[in-house]
Amino acid sequence: NQQSGXSETKVVVG
């Protein structure tokens, strides 16, 4: 998971 600006973005790479 990447966390930026106090918000969490979940990225799935296939």
Swiss-Prot record:
Record's keyword terms, sorted: IgA-binding protein, Lectin
Keyword Translocase: no
Domain of life where this protein originates: Eukaryota
MF term (GO), any: IgA binding
SS bond list: none
Keyword Ribosomal protein: no
Family, per entry: Belongs to the jacalin lectin family.
Description of how the protein assembles with itself and partners: Tetramer of four alpha chains associated with two or four beta chains.
Function according to Swiss-Prot or TrEMBL: N-acetyl-galactosamine and D-galactose specific lectin. Binds the Tn-antigen structure GalNAc-alpha-1-O-Ser, the T-antigen structure Gal-beta1-3-GalNAc and IgA.
Identification of the protein by name: Agglutinin beta-1 chain isoform 1
Species per Swiss-Prot/TrEMBL record: Morus nigra (Black mulberry)
